[in-house]
């Protein structure tokens, strides 16, 4: 009997610990549930949406204590169940800054990956919060981990994708391009130094379900970047121009695509199975053969957005912004059409096949079809509301940042655009306001 009592006590404590552990974890989608909208302010997996609660200004994130785990509220990352744009069971997933200048949420497997301002001190004892740190956390809210922090992040760029069943992250810090193998103990490879621009195709999970049907994956295994010449390429002899290079993510092989003397090349997009770049002020592109170069412009333009391919694999063309007007130009043309696609001064915030999501001068958000110019209003801010400059669109849900009356920060809102054709859209606030943020 004396032996039996300690056993009962041990079983009781084990049971309590088990249920306590279960209670602390967040409900999660099934491992095989599909992911939509990777990259940006939000991402959906199954019936759950993961999103930034609000936005922190750059000045706020520079505070030495602004990003301590457990103390972040306004810009932290939340999770909720989502059904037809309605959210329930909202819960803070991680108390770290997720809503800031470089917001980027991705889900691969059962982990959420996100960027957050750096919290570590450098050699001088200063916390360089202007540098990002790539972190991960399990979807149940456990095991927050820091993965990679570059030494700088000036005019940087970040992307994630799955290639041949393995997940990679790519960080361009303004000078150096690095690759992180997340399935290989977060192994970091420096792809190239002296990089001046970088692009890669987006992972299929960044696109809507409809757009995935016509994706061209021929360039998915490559990174493309421009870099300065090295000593062997005439750097010390004053040879002008730079190098356009591709990098095979799987094999590590590098191939020079262009090294024109006195020509400066800048990579801009990888879309629809084509690499887009500029030489001087003109836009060009190449397909996956890398042998046929198309020139798209002869004049300096204000904006250049490739639309990729339609449902049948047809080329949808390019939206060019010129003299504050939109022009829809065929991929094979190099002269801007005589007639404008839109006379309005618009800014593109997202593209989903033939749908172009734009913001007008009054902060109204519209979708325009490149096929027939049909236009639908997706969102119109209320009087005295201020719209942020970050947006996220996954083909259905539009997530944006907007001011809330009597509060200092912008908080997240969601619009279910599937009701737009019937004029039924409205923005629902999903960000949870914080008392300490009151004016």
Language-model features, listed with the residues they occupy:
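Positively charged n-region of N-terminal signal peptides that target proteins for export
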Residues: 1-5
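C-terminal motif of bacterial Sec signal peptides marking the signal peptidase cleavage site
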Residues: 18-21
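Surface-exposed loop/turn elements that mediate protein-protein interactions on large endomembrane-trafficking
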Residues: 23-31, 62-95, 125-149, 174-197, ...
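Beta-strand-rich domains and repeat architectures in extracellular enzymes and scaffolds
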Residues: 28-77, 96-104
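Repeated scaffold domains used in trafficking and secretory/extracellular systems
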Residues: 35-43, 99-109, 152-164, 194-217, ...
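Generic beta-strand structural signal
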Residues: 44, 82, 107, 129, ...
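Residue position within the beta-strands of beta-propeller blades
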Residues: 50-52, 113-116, 169-171, 207, ...
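Non-cytosolic head/periplasmic domains of membrane-anchored proteins
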Residues: 114-117, 132-139, 143-161, 168-171
């Amino acid at each position: 009997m004396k032996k039996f009592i300690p056993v009962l006590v041990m079983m009781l404590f084990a049971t309590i610990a088990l249920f306590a552990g279960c209670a602390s974890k967040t409900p999660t989608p099934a491992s095989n549930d599909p992911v939509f909208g990777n990259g940006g302010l939000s991402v959906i997996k199954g019936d759950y949406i993961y999103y930034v609660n609000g936005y922190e200004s750059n000045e706020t994130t520079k505070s030495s204590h602004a990003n301590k785990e457990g103390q972040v509220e306004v810009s932290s990352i939340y999770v909720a169940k989502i059904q037809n744009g309605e959210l329930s069971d909202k819960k803070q997933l991680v108390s770290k800054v997720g809503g800031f200048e470089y917001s980027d949420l991705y889900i691969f497997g059962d982990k959420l990956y996100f960027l957050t301002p750096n919290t570590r001190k450098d050699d001088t004892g200063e916390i360089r919060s202007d540098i990002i740190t790539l972190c991960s956390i399990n979807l149940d809210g456990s095991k927050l981990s820091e993965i990679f922090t570059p030494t700088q992040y000036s005019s940087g760029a970040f992307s994630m994708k799955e290639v041949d069943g393995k997940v990679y992250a790519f960080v361009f810090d303004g000078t150096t391009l690095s690759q992180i193998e997340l399935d290989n103990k977060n192994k970091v490879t420096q792809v190239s130094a002296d990089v001046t621009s970088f692009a890669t195709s987006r992972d299929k999970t960044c696109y809507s379900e409809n757009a995935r049907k016509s994706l061209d994956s021929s360039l998915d295994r490559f990174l493309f970047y421009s870099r300065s010449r090295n000593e062997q390429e005439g750097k010390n002899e004053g040879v002008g121009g730079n190098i356009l290079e591709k990098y095979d993510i799987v094999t590590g092989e590098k191939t020079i695509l262009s090294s024109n003397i006195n020509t400066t090349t800048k990579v801009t997009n990888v879309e629809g199975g084509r690499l887009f770049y500029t030489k001087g002020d003109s836009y060009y592109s190449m397909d996956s053969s890398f042998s046929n170069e198309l020139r798209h412009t002869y004049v300096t333009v204000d904006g250049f957005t490739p639309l990729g391919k339609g449902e049948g694999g047809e080329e949808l063309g390019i939206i060019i912004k010129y003299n504050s007007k939109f022009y829809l130009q065929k991929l094979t043309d190099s002269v801007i059409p005589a007639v404008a696609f839109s006379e309005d001064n618009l800014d593109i915030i997202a593209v989903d096949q033939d749908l172009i999501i734009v913001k007008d001068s009054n902060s109204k958000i519209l979708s325009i079809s490149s096929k027939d110019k049909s236009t639908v209003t997706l969102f119109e801010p209320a009087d005295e509301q201020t719209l942020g400059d970050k947006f996220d669109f996954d083909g259905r849900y539009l997530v944006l940042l907007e001011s809330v009356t009597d509060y200092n920060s912008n908080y997240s809102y969601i619009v279910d655009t599937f009701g737009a054709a019937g004029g039924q859209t409205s923005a629902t606030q999903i960000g949870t306001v914080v008392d300490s943020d009151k004016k």
